[in-house]
A protein has these predicted regions:
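Surface-exposed patches in mature extracellular/periplasmic domains of secreted proteins
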Residues: 100-110, 154-157, 181-190
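Hydrophobic/aromatic-lined pockets within catalytic cores
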Residues: 149, 176-180, 277, 281
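Extracytoplasmic/secreted envelope proteins and their assembly/folding machinery
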Residues: 87-91, 138, 142, 168-172, ...
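Short alpha-beta junction capping motif
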Residues: 51, 117, 122-168
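Hydrophobic h-region of N-terminal signal peptides that target proteins for export
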Residues: 9-21
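Bacterial N-terminal signal peptides that target proteins for export
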Residues: 1-10
């Protein structure tokens, strides 16, 4: 079993996984929004940490069913939303705002027999209102989390049908396979996760790129208006799953260099991520 190896790093007192010393090779995947995004020149450099992105099967049949985008490219799965621009902008922020020794590129991870997920301490899932975990994937994700892993999920909206999908119900259907015996709860404002680096007692909705077209900060109608910071905890009270519902942090990181996207939204999205990452590495 791979487990964490704790050590102090400056004032943060972070922890790293010994498995990172034998990091898996970096690989790029086709994406919905970006057909060709530049790779940083230092992408092969060795570092202690990076954030992994979950490649999951979805309700439309990916990866088994072949579908096509409007431009004729094969549909690469909802898991690629905002990828890789969002990931690399975020990792630049980790380098600037923390002392975490991070790579400049993300790591895409699949829940499969390779057990690669156990090499990466932080896992991110986007558009989880469309995922569809099988029994094997749910079991491996559960084991990953109970061993000390941290899963942050983002960019799903509302409780009523949105483009024909009840995203909250779809999310919880798969999550209940992962943890049938654990409840989803709201994170209180005084929880340590909101105060590891930045004090984030006061928070607001972080909108996605839909704002550029609609001028709205929410999606999915009335039930998408209120942002929810929720979680699932382990037996010791540690947050294992951080659930960002009715917000789109991924778009905030992705468009943080876009003048039309308000600085206050991008700033909060980065601060939430920095707090969540340092919480995980110190708990």
């Amino acid at each position: 079993m791979r487990i964490r190896t704790a050590f102090a790093v400056g004032f943060l007192g972070l922890a790293a996984w010994s498995a990172l010393r034998a990091q898996k090779p970096f690989k790029e995947w086709p994406a919905i929004e970006y057909a060709d995004f530049p790779v940083p020149p230092d992408y092969q450099d060795k570092h202690e940490w990076t954030r992994a992105r979950l490649r999951y099967p979805d309700i439309y049949g990916y990866p088994g069913r072949i579908m096509f985008l409007d431009d004729g490219r094969p549909f690469p799965g909802y898991w690629t939303m905002d990828y890789p621009r969002s990931d690399r902008h975020l990792l630049e922020g980790v380098r600037r705002l923390t002392r975490i020794d991070t790579k400049s590129v993300e790591q895409v991870v699949t829940l499969d027999e390779s057990e690669e997920v156990f090499n990466w301490p932080v896992l991110y899932g986007v558009e989880v209102g469309h995922w569809n975990l099988g029994d094997f994937e749910a079991k491996q994700l559960r084991e990953y989390l109970l061993r000390g892993g941290f899963f942050m999920c983002d960019d799903f909206h509302g409780t009523e049908p949105y483009h024909g999908v009840r995203e909250w119900d779809t999310f919880t259907r798969s999550m209940s396979k992962v943890f049938p015996d654990r409840e989803i709860e709201d994170i209180p404002d005084n929880d340590p996760i909101f105060h590891t680096i930045y004090d984030l007692q006061e928070r607001f909705q972080v909108p996605g790129a839909v704002y550029f077209e609609s001028g709205l900060t929410y999606e999915a109608g009335e039930t998408g208006k209120v942002p929810h910071w929720r979680c699932i905890r382990d037996d010791k009270g540690r947050i294992m799953v951080a659930i960002c519902h009715n917000m789109d942090l991924g778009d905030a990181w992705e468009h943080s260099d876009e003048p039309r996207y308000l600085e206050k939204w991008a700033s909060l999205a980065y601060r939430i991520a920095m707090n969540y990452f340092t919480y995980d590495l110190s708990h």
